[in-house]
A protein has these predicted regions:
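Conserved helicase RecA-like core
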Residues: 1-393
Length: 393
């Protein structure tokens, strides 16, 4: 019987999509489990159609879930399991009232799971309101901070910040870098400045439309873009297998946020690099971070400015976009077969393949981009020809 039995609330669309993907993977061997994602930024109509067909598990963001409840298009009357993922970030984003409104629509007799990277007073208060004698489980970190090399660089004037960012990218030349900025405007300014100086860089923030966000994440995760400049909120839920470097464009306002930022690099036994830029006006934050880490922040000599004359790092991969996706029954194997068929490119030159409802993306090595593009344009997928283009910029 199709009824919503479990509800998972996430702060961002990216995290909701990631959670839904993992749930679908886990449910593969359970017959006919339907998992539905309901997030803002996506059209409302298709969500209504999906709800009419029913679902067992709904994963979504508070704003869109609350909207469906207001319009009477979502019934939570039979939910037996409620999950709040990254609850601290949801409250930071101002979703407290939405969360309370949603919880009021869920039966009181239920299992409630609340996950939070931090445990401030706001989370204690939320737990007290929505949970009944909860058990606290503290997960020990399996991430070894010793695998991360931390560097701090101090400069006098704030107007030097963009130049300092380029200087660090020239100095360390990481293949993939996540730059954390505090505001949407800074992400755009940072990415624009880097592109104007030859870097492959994109911005990620909460105001991007869903299609644009998907494309940004595809290009960064498949290594056809080397620098992603993002806000903390937009970066939540990012699932990047191997991240070479994290750069803090500013020292984080909260020391715990700093630790979570740099913990994205140096995973799975690999070495990580974390660089933090701060101006003289941020000295107090550096002091507070040092107290939190239990060590004095020692800043290093800035790299030589002559490095700015060097060419920027070029990503090893290029992304090709195909105007056909899941709705046209296009699968990764179809794309790989079309690329590597007679007179095609070598299989080892093909990277990550991402399939969406109406489009697909495939990464190929830079030196194979032209023959790969020719091969896809001249061939067919599922017996059909699709428009194919190389994504640049």
């Amino acid at each position: 019987r199709f009824r919503v039995q479990s509800l998972v609330l996430c702060p961002t669309r990216e995290l909701a999509d990631q959670v839904a993907r993992e749930l679908r993977r886990l449910a593969r061997y359970q017959h006919n489990v339907k998992i539905l994602t309901l997030c803002g930024g996506a059209p409302f109509g298709p969500q209504l159609d999906s709800l009419r067909h029913g679902a067992h598990i709904v994963v979504g963001t508070p704003g869109r879930i609350e909207e469906h409840l207001r319009k009477g298009t979502l019934n939570l009357g039979e939910v037996s399991c409620l999950v709040l993922d990254e609850a601290d970030r949801m409250l930071d984003m101002g979703f407290r009232e939405s969360v309370d409104a949603i919880v009021s629509q869920v039966p009181k007799k239920r299992q409630t799971l609340l996950f939070s990277a931090t445990y401030p007073e706001s989370i204690r208060s939320l737990s007290g309101r929505i949970m009944n004698r909860p058990q606290m489980v503290i997960a020990e970190s399996r991430h070894d901070d010793r695998s991360i090399r931390q560097h701090f660089f101090r400069f006098e004037q704030n107007k030097q910040r963009l130049t300092m960012l380029r200087l660090l990218l020239h100095r360390f030349r990481p293949e993939s870098t996540l730059v954390f900025s505090n505001t949407k405007r800074e992400t755009e300014e940072g990415a624009d400045d880097l592109r104007s100086h030859g870097f492959s860089a994109l911005a990620l923030h909460g105001d991007l439309e869903q299609r644009a966000r998907d494309q940004v994440l595809v290009r960064f995760s498949n290594r056809s873009t080397s620098v992603l400049v993002a806000t903390d909120v937009a970066a939540r839920g990012l699932d990047i297998e191997k991240l070479d470097a994290v750069i803090n464009y500013h020292i984080a306002r909260d020391p715990e946020v700093h630790v979570h930022r740099i913990g994205r690099t140096g995973r799975a036994g690999s070495k990580g690099l974390a660089c933090t830029l701060f101006s003289a006006s941020e000295d107090y934050r550096a002091e507070r971070l040092g107290e939190y880490l239990g060590e004095k922040i020692e800043y290093e000599t800035l790299p030589a400015f002559s490095l700015l004359e060097k060419p920027a790092f070029r990503p090893p991969m290029v992304t090709l976009q195909i105007d056909g996706g899941r709705k046209q029954k296009v699968r990764p194997g179809d794309i790989l077969g079309a690329l590597t068929g007679e007179d095609g490119v070598a299989g080892k030159q093909v990277g990550k393949i991402n399939i969406f409802d109406f489009s697909a993306y495939v990464a190929v090595e830079r030196n194979a981009a032209k023959p790969a593009l020719r091969k896809l344009r001249s061939g067919t997928l599922k017996g059909r020809s699709f428009r194919v283009r190389r994504i640049s910029g």
